[in-house]
Amino acid sequence: MIGILNRWRQFGRRYFWPHLLLGMVAASLGLPTSLNESQDIVSHPNSASSVSRQNSVSLSLTDLVALKEAHRRSSYSVDYWHQHAIRTVIRHLSFALTTPQTANAQQVDELQPHSLVLLDTLNALLTQDSQFPFVISPHAGRVTFYPQAHHQIGIWLAQIRGIRAGPYLLS
């Protein structure tokens, strides 16, 4: 019986918890924007909306967590458990993506850019504010704002790392 419990504990440590945390991070990347959109539903308790009590309780608990962290980081939009899951995934990835000391230089060069981009993007999720990207159009001379494009990869890269495609000025 003890052997079965030890095997189950080892299975959980090696496979279950890292994959669960990775799933939490992947599923919660869109969570802060959806919480901000649903705050007006929670603020009207007598409305005839289809929000259940469990959803309203979970939203108010995350609002409490956000209020707790508001005095530490006033412009930080990721709640505590999202931050904890991202940090744990960064820790797991940093150990998983490190190459052994006996590896060839060619293998190290192939692995290095991918692992650095992955860790840098997760670190940027922790340290940078979430802002919508602004596109400056050289033809119109005004700033255009795109609030609906939450899940487009180009907009996401422009938001997180300032990466954009094409030349800066058209000549």
UniProtKB/Swiss-Prot annotation:
GO terms for molecular function: translation regulator activity. Keywords: Cytoplasm, Periplasm, Signal. Disulfide bonds: none annotated. Residues 1-30 form the signal peptide. One of its GO terms (cellular component) is periplasmic space. It comes from the Bacteria. It is found in: Cytoplasm, Cytosol; Periplasm. It holds the Pfam family SecM. Regulates secA expression by translational coupling of the secM secA operon. Translational pausing at a specific Pro residue 5 residues before the end of the protein may allow disruption of a mRNA repressor helix that normally suppresses secA translation initiation. Belongs to the SecM family. This is Secretion monitor. It comes from Pectobacterium atrosepticum (strain SCRI 1043 / ATCC BAA-672). The gene is secM.
